[in-house]
Amino acid sequence: MDKGEEDQDVSHQDLIKQYRKPLETCTNKCFCKKCCYHCQFCFLRKGLGITYHAFRTRRKKIASADRIPVPQQSISIRGRDSQTTQESQKKVEEQAKANLRISRKNLGDETRGPVGAGN
């Protein structure tokens, strides 16, 4: 064997050893391109977003429907005055009638001819 072939065998064995050893943890929190690709661990975790043995935080389970207390008030009472009172309806009607009278007076004061009549 040549010296070059021996070096190649040694380098292949080194690569296999490096492949089999566990990935070293990296404490760098940066997500720039240089930091994402500097090692296999960071590429998997930062570049691809793959994490192993990371437990997800879970929400507490919601109480079942029979345990939820029924509110004593109706929905319309709980809302912020969603139902209009009769007094406020009367005020609105009176204002609308007053505005209608004023606008009709303004229309009568105009001295225009009928629509469609050519001058």
Swiss-Prot record:
Residues 71-87 have a biased composition (Polar residues). Signal peptide: none annotated. GO terms for molecular function: RNA binding; RNA-binding transcription regulator activity. Residues 43-53 are annotated as: Core. It comes from the Viruses. GO terms for cellular component: host cell nucleolus. Residues 26-42 are annotated as: Cysteine-rich. A motif (Nuclear localization signal, and RNA-binding (TAR)) lies at residues 54-60. It is found in: Host nucleus, Host nucleolus. Residues 65-119 are annotated as: Disordered. Keywords: Activator, Host nucleus, Host-virus interaction, RNA-binding, Transcription, Transcription regulation. The keyword Transcription applies. GO terms for biological process: positive regulation of viral transcription. It holds the Pfam family Tat. The keyword RNA-binding applies. Transcriptional activator that increases RNA Pol II processivity, thereby increasing the level of full-length viral transcripts. Recognizes a hairpin structure at the 5'-LTR of the nascent viral mRNAs referred to as the transactivation responsive RNA element (TAR) and recruits the cyclin T1-CDK9 complex (P-TEFb complex) that will in turn hyperphosphorylate the RNA polymerase II to allow efficient elongation. The CDK9 component of P-TEFb and other Tat-activated kinases hyperphosphorylate the C-terminus of RNA Pol II that becomes stabilized and much more processive. Extracellular circulating Tat can be endocytosed by surrounding uninfected cells via the binding to several surface receptors. Endosomal low pH allows Tat to cross the endosome membrane to enter the cytosol and eventually further translocate into the nucleus, thereby inducing severe cell dysfunctions ranging from cell activation to cell death. Through. Belongs to the lentiviruses Tat family. The 155 isolate is from a monkey imported from Kenya. Interacts with host CCNT1. Associates with the P-TEFb complex composed at least of Tat, P-TEFb (CDK9 and CCNT1), TAR RNA, RNA Pol II. Interacts with CCNT2; the resulting complex is unable to bind to TAR RNA. This is Protein Tat. It comes from Simian immunodeficiency virus agm.vervet (isolate AGM155) (SIV-agm.ver). The lineage of its organism: Viruses, Riboviria, Pararnavirae, Artverviricota, Revtraviricetes.
